[in-house]
Amino acid sequence: MKRPWNRTNSNVYSLMTSCEKASYNMNICTYVSVVNIKPKIYLISIDKSTLTFKNLTNNPVSIVLQSLSIKNIKLVKLLGKKSGFTYNKQRALENRKLTSLWKGHNVLNDCCFLIELHKLKKIHEMHDHCIFTFEIKSFKNFNHNFLTFQCLIENKIIL
C-alpha cells in the first residue's frame, strides 16, 4: 500500500514565474491549497533548489498558477524533471508552440484554469521546500479534464 501522502488525488499545476527581462520559467507543483475565502489565498510549497524559488524570491513580478489538463501530461517531464537553471524551458515550449498569451503572461495551452497571483510573503522555510502565500488577482476557467496526481502514477511518470 502507498504511503498516506501519496494516496491523494489532487490537481497537478504548473507555476509560471518571471525571470530577467522578458523571459519566464515554468515548473510542476502538486503542493497547492486554497486556505482562505475572502480574500482568496493560496499556499504553494516550492522546492528551494529550483529556478522557480529563485524567481519568487528575487523577482516576483509575473506569477500564474496553471491547472494542467490531461492534454498537458507530456509536459510534466519537461517542466518537472528538468531544471530551469540548465535547460531553457521557455525556448522548448515556444519552439513546440505550446504557449499563448493571457493578460500579457506566457501560459500553457490547454489548461483547465489560470490564476494570476500576487505574492504576499514567504511564510515557512523547511529543509527542501518553502511555503509561499499568494493572493488571487484574476482567473479564467477553461475545461474540467484535470490532470491529477493519480494520472501521473498510472502513467508511470512518478512513484
Please state what every model-predicted region is.
Residues M1-L159:
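Basic, polyanion-binding surface patches
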